[in-house]
Structure formats: structure tokens, C-alpha cells
């Protein structure tokens, strides 16, 4: 299961709900957070993870394809990775691993895996980060992925239920 959402609207209620969802995921014994700026400051997403236990965070350098491969491996090992990509534009580099492997695991094996992928659509306010940071590829990934649900989180009240559903999915 993937949860891919809109994140950077600078609305404190939106942030608060993201943080509440990440704290909830962090309390589950089988979750591990993977990605850039999960342990160390570097993106707007970092602050939503500040109360997640340190032993549940795996900091990675900029290596999106490798990160997706690690996510696949963690899921195959029976854990629940929450793989974090700061922007959709960066997630593009992980497409091979997600489309060709994570999406197909249940079709090519007896494994029942869980994985949550979190990404964001860059905000153009209060400061425009330039075009390589504001892509929204939600619809494109919905076309490419047949076994992974894509959930776009536009409103704060959507956030916690979506992550709870992703975690509890069988």
C-alpha cells in the first residue's frame, strides 16, 4: 500500500495531522522510516518525524532508486517501511523499483507485503521552489500501478485516516 500526498500547504492543522499520523505509525512495532532527512533536518517533512523513535529511522543519502529497493527488501522481510521522498519530482527516480517490483510482488510471489510511500507536492507559496520541485504525478502513477493504491491528501481531515488505513490493510 502506498500513501502519496500533498504536503506543503503551510497550514498548521495539516502539519499537525501529518505529525499525528507519523507518531501513530512510529508506535507500531514493525514500522521503519526510510529516506532523506528522516533523522537529520533537511526538509519540511523532518519536523513531522521529530517524536518518532530514533531506532525506527534509517537515514539515506540522495539515492531514490536504491531507497525504493531497500523499501522493497524491508517489506519482503516482513516489516513495514515508510519510505519518504520530499517531492514527487525526486520520486520519479524510484519508479523502476516501485512499478516493476513493489507493485508486482503479490502477483509474482506468495508474499503479502506492506509499504507506505510518502511524498509531497511542492508549494509555490510563500516561495516558489522552481519547477523541478512542484510536480504532481498522482494521476500518472495511478495509471502505472495496478496493485498499489495512490491516495492524494488535500485536506487535513484526510491524513490520519489514510495512514491508519494503510497500516491496517491486510
Model feature map: region roles:
Residues 1-170:
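Thiamine diphosphate
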Amino acid at each position: 500500500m502506498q500513501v502519496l500526498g500533498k504536503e506543503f500547504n503551510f497550514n498548521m492543522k495539516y502539519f499537525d495531522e501529518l505529525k499525528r499520523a507519523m507518531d501513530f505509525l512510529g508506535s507500531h512495532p514493525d514500522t521503519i522510516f526510510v529516506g532523506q532527512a528522516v533523522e537529520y533536518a533537511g526538509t519540511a517533512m523532518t519536523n513531522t518525524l521529530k517524536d518518532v523513535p530514533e531506532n525506527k529511522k534509517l537515514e539515506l543519502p540522495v539515492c531514490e532508486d536504491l531507497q525504493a529497493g531497500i523499501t522493497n527488501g524491508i517489506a519482503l522481510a516482513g516489516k513495514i517501511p515508510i519510505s519518504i521522498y520530499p517531492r514527487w519530482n525526486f520520486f520519479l527516480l524510484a519508479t523502476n523499483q516501485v512499478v516493476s517490483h513493489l507493485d508486482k510482488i503479490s502477483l509474482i510471489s506468495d508474499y503479502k507485503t506492506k509499504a507506505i510511500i510518502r511524498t509531497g507536492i511542492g508549494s509555490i507559496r510563500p516561495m516558489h521552489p522552481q519547477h523541478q520541485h512542484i510536480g504532481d504525478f498522482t494521476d500518472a502513477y495511478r495509471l502505472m500501478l495496478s496493485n498499489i493504491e495512490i491516495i492524494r491528501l488535500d485536506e487535513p481531515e484526510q491524513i490520519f485516516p489514510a495512514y491508519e488505513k494503510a497500516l491496517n490493510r491486510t
